[in-house]
Structure formats: structure tokens, C-alpha cells
């Protein structure tokens, strides 16, 4: 028997797969006793085929839902007729979508009385797409945030109902920033739900939120491994942003020549700091005079603090320098 619902309570369908969604979904679950709200079902992406090594990749939303006894569904397409029929039968008031991985078409959005809201990891309309957190770091942005939009069929294109802004820390990686933004997103999601709770129907209320400015739209496509290769002619800050933006995946890398008689060695770069001065272009990619492992770049040098050679454990730049007996002036970076 379902618990009695209050007059302004909401019946949710949650849609998400990755870790970014979990804090906001958990906040919704925790307030059900006080609000009379209900979670009708949780939709996640289907599990991919299991590869020969290891099990299926983690699905934090699935794990969270199952740990709390919530019903879970994983249709191949949220927009196929059978799934739409199932959604409609749930008689939901609101879809809450975050880190799901499928674009909802009009029939899916119209299955709930109030449509859907989506928590996105950027200050829209900047960085629409799959990698907003990473793209903000790679672009050298000093601040970012989260946005909650009232959903339309256009990817991340709906009007903004709530947002929160935060500075990007100088030493923050994409993984660390994403965790922090997921927590900041809880408050923005609550604000958006609070607004929708007072609405009887979308037809009677009219447009929700502030339309996005088309002139300020930028894209945030998925990262590729090729993008992670370091260009040592770039500035130190650009290299630092690349290293932080590419963690935890795909991880920035370079090819080093530690032995002229062997092929270049691929090395993952996991932590750097920069030292800027009037640079000499002839030093780009060379080992610099420094107590640690410093490499010449476009505007000075980058000190490599942590790295991981292919097939080896992570180590300090200094240990790598000592182990390969690198000397100042040596051309370390393969062209």
C-alpha cells in the first residue's frame, strides 16, 4: 500500500546513471517523509556487455536505488513506444534527469504532468554536452557552476530554472570538481523542485525559467584520448589546465626519449606546477636546470611532480629524472 500523499506532494521518476546524479537523488529520497513525495521508478542506462576482464562498469545510480529498495528499469531507449507507455502508466508529476546519457523526446517529456528538469554541470548556455566539467577546466575558466533547466527536446537547451556558481580551485582536477559540483547541485535541484511544486499544470502557468541566450552557447563534446597529448609549445597554464582537466580520464600524456636506441616511451602526466619567465623557444621539450624534473614550454617551464611511465607505477618526476639520469639540455620530449 502506497503512503498517503499530501496535497502538494510530487511523484517522481528519476533518470540517471553516473555519480553526478546521486547526491540530488538522495536529497529527494530523504525528504519523502516530510513532503509526502514518492519515487515511482528509477531509470538507468542498460549495462554494456561484460568484457573478458573484470565485471561491468559501475553504475552509481543503480547501486544507490537498489540499496534503498527503489524499482529500477534500464530500457535500451527511453523513447521507444513500450517505454513511453510504461512511463505514462507511472502517472508521474515530474521527471528529474541527471547524468543519464539519453536525450528525451517530446513523448517522454510529456509523460509527466510537469515535464522534466535536468541538472547540468555548467553555467548554461556554456558547455552544452557530455563533458561540461572537463571543458571548463581545459578552457582555463576561473569559475563554473551548475544549472537546472526545464527540459526541451534540444540537448541542454531548456530555460534555466535555478543555478549556482563556484570558483574553480587552482589545484582542482575534473574528478574533484565534478564531485563538488554534484553537491552544489543539490541546492539548485531543491530550488527548482520548490518552484514546480506550486504549479498545477504547465498549460496554466506558462513558461518556466529564463531562456538561454543563443549567442552564448558553447559545446562540451566527450573527451578523446588524442586530446590528452601535451603540446609543450603551449603556455604553462594551458598545460596545467590540460593535466587537471584530463583526470581521471583519459589522463594527459607525452612521449619521452630516454634512450635514443629505443622507441619513445609514453608517460602519463598526473601533476605539474608552472614557472613562467621569458622563454627561449629552443628549450621547448628540453630538460631544464632544476632540482626537480622541469621541461621547457611556451612561456617558461613546467615542473612535473607526478607521472606514470607505460607499464610502471606512478612516481615522482624527480625519481624519473634520477632513474633515467636525465641532464639539463637533454631533448626529452619526442617530436
UniProtKB/Swiss-Prot annotation:
- Catalyzes what? L-methionyl-tRNA(fMet) + (6R)-10-formyltetrahydrofolate = N-formyl-L-methionyl-tRNA(fMet) + (6S)-5,6,7,8-tetrahydrofolate + H(+)
The residues that the entry says bind (6S)-5,6,7,8-tetrahydrofolate are: 122-125
| Cellular component per GO, a single term | cytosol
Q: What is its EC number?
A: 2.1.2.9
Q: Which UniProt keywords apply?
A: Protein biosynthesis, Transferase
Top-rank taxon: Bacteria
The GO annotation for biological process reads: conversion of methionyl-tRNA to N-formyl-methionyl-tRNA
- Give the matching Pfam families: Formyl_trans_C (PF02911), Formyl_trans_N (PF00551)
The family database entries (InterPro entries) matched by this protein are listed as:
Fmt (IPR005794), Formyl_trans_C (IPR005793), Formyl_transf_N (IPR002376), Formyl_transf_N_sf (IPR036477), Formyl_transferase-like_C_sf (IPR011034), Met-tRNA-FMT_C (IPR044135), Met-tRNA-FMT_N (IPR041711)
Uppermost EC category: transferase
Please list the GO terms describing molecular function: methionyl-tRNA formyltransferase activity
Where do the record's region annotations for Disordered lie?
203-222
Q: What does this protein do?
A: Attaches a formyl group to the free amino group of methionyl-tRNA(fMet). The formyl group appears to play a dual role in the initiator identity of N-formylmethionyl-tRNA by promoting its recognition by IF2 and preventing the misappropriation of this tRNA by the elongation apparatus.
**Record PANTHER family:** METHIONYL-TRNA FORMYLTRANSFERASE (PTHR11138), METHIONYL-TRNA FORMYLTRANSFERASE, MITOCHONDRIAL (PTHR11138:SF5)
Q: Which NCBIfam families match?
A: fmt
Q: Which family does it belong to?
A: Belongs to the Fmt family.
The molecule here is called: Methionyl-tRNA formyltransferase
Question: Organism, per UniProt?
Answer: Rhodopirellula baltica (strain DSM 10527 / NCIMB 13988 / SH1)
Amino acid at each position: 500500500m502506497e503512503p498517503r500523499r499530501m496535497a502538494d506532494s510530487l511523484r517522481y521518476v528519476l533518470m540517471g546513471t553516473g555519480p553526478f546524479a546521486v547526491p540530488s537523488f538522495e536529497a529527494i529520497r530523504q525528504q519523502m517523509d516530510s513532503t509526502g513525495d514518492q519515487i515511482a521508478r528509477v531509470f538507468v542506462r542498460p549495462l554494456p556487455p561484460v568484457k573478458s576482464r573484470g565485471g561491468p562498469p559501475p553504475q552509481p545510480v543503480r547501486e544507490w536505488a537498489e540499496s534503498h529498495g527503489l524499482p529500477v528499469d534500464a530500457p535500451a531507449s527511453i523513447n521507444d513506444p513500450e517505454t513511453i507507455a510504461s512511463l505514462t502508466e507511472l502517472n508521474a508529476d515530474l521527471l528529474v534527469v541527471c547524468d543519464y546519457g539519453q536525450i528525451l523526446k517530446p513523448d517522454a517529456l510529456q509523460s509527466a504532468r510537469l515535464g522534466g528538469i535536468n541538472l547540468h554541470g555548467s553555467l548554461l548556455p556554456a558547455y552544452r554536452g557530455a563533458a561540461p566539467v572537463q571543458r571548463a577546466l581545459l578552457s582555463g575558466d576561473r569559475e563554473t557552476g551548475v544549472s537546472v533547466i526545464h527540459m526541451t527536446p534540444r540537448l541542454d537547451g531548456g530555460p534555466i530554472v535555478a543555478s549556482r556558481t563556484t570558483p574553480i580551485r587552482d589545484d582542482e582536477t575534473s574528478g574533484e570538481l565534478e564531485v563538488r559540483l554534484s553537491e552544489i547541485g543539490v541546492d539548485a535541484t531543491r530550488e527548482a523542485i520548490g518552484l514546480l511544486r506550486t504549479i498545477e499544470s504547465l498549460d496554466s502557468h506558462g513558461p518556466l525559467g529564463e531562456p538561454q541566450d543563443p549567442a552564448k552557447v558553447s559545446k562540451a563534446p566527450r573527451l578523446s584520448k588524442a586530446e590528452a597529448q601535451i603540446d609543450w609549445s603551449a603556455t604553462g597554464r594551458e598545460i596545467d589546465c590540460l593535466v587537471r582537466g584530463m583526470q581521471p580520464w583519459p589522463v594527459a600524456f607525452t612521449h619521452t626519449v630516454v634512450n635514443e636506441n629505443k622507441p619513445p616511451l609514453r608517460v602519463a602526466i598526473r601533476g605539474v606546477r608552472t614557472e613562467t619567465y621569458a622563454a627561449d623557444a629552443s628549450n621547448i621539450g628540453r630538460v631544464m636546470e632544476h632540482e626537480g624534473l622541469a621541461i621547457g614550454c611556451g612561456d617558461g617551464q613546467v615542473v612535473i611532480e607526478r607521472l606514470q611511465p607505460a607499464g610502471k607505477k606512478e612516481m615522482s618526476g624527480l625519481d624519473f629524472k634520477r632513474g633515467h639520469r636525465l641532464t639539463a639540455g637533454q631533448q626529452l620530449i619526442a617530436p
